[in-house]
């Protein structure tokens, strides 16, 4: 299980099948107002792009790119931190971020066994950017395991897919659900994928924006605003042990990547604190 939160601070098209978001059906989470898009792209400068790969009977995966700031991130790195909630994963680039407290590339999310090819592609993309010389580079790539529906051993995500996600990145609405790195993932025993939201603090508290993007792939007992939805629908982790009805479920397994961005002027030390609170927010979902 990997639960990683990547925090950033600095001063596309819709999914194939458009579905209502939580607030569209009257489910309002929290007390603060959302940004205009209710997405991580409400934080000025943040762009998100997806590339979805569906091939044959066994490839269901993709890449999601988060570009956290305009310009060349290598020559103009921004404060960042990676907070690990549970460290069973194959993330690339963590140690340097935790040493220097800054990020120098975009972030790529993909499937577990694609992280190395994705990191190589991100490296190649960075060296094509204006102002890059011959330097070492610390690509940031996170992952979740989508092997229930995806043959990740075929290494379906590489140069072309990562380049497409990066080059398609925009500051507009963010496609959610079975798209990009969320194509083959699940949550709480149902289909999961990519999700995003944002909140804006009142002017008296600085007026800052906080945006989140997640790649879900985990189990639990789904709660929506405190309502025990998973329990009521009898679809939750460890159900087969509590109410024996066979062993056809693996809802207790999984992972999640959480990317948090803000325009609040926070240091890497305080971004770590934000990451801890993001894990608390995850716990509230069940």
What are these regions (language model features)?
Residues 16-286:
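Alpha/propeptide regions of enzymes that mature by internal proteolysis
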Residues 1-9:
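Bacterial N-terminal signal peptides
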Residues 11-15:
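Sec/Tat signal peptide C-region and signal peptidase I cleavage site
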């Amino acid at each position: 299980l990997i639960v990683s939160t990547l925090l950033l601070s600095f001063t596309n098209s819709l999914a194939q099948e458009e579905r209502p978001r939580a607030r569209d059906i009257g489910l309002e989470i929290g007390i603060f107002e959302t940004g205009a898009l209710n997405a991580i792209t409400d934080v000025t400068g943040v762009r998100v792009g997806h590339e979805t790969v569906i091939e044959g009977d066994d490839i269901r995966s993709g890449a999601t790119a988060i570009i956290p700031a305009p310009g060349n991130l290598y020559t103009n790195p921004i404060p960042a931190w990676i907070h690990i909630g549970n460290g069973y994963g194959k993330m690339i680039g963590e140690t340097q971020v935790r040493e220097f407290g800054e990020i120098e590339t975009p972030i790529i999310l993909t499937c577990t066994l694609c992280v190395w090819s994705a990191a190589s592609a991100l490296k190649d993309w960075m060296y094509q950017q204006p102002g890059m010389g011959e330097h070492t580079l610390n690509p940031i790539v996170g992952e979740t395991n989508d092997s229930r529906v995806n043959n990740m051993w075929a290494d379906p995500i590489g140069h072309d897919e990562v380049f497409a996600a990066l080059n398609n990145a925009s500051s507009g609405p963010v496609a959610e659900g079975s798209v990009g790195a969320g194509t083959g993932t699940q949550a709480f025993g149902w289909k999961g994928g990519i999700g995003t939201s944002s909140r804006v603090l009142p002017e008296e508290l600085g007026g800052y924006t906080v945006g989140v993007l997640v790649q879900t792939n985990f189990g639990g007992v789904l709660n929506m605003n405190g309502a025990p939805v998973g329990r009521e629908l009898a679809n939750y982790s460890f159900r087969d042990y509590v109410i024996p009805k066979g062993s056809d479920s693996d809802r207790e397994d999984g992972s999640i990547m959480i990317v948090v961005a803000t325009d609040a002027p926070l240091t890497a030390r305080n971004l770590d604190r934000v990451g801890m609170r993001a894990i608390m927010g995850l716990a509230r979902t069940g």
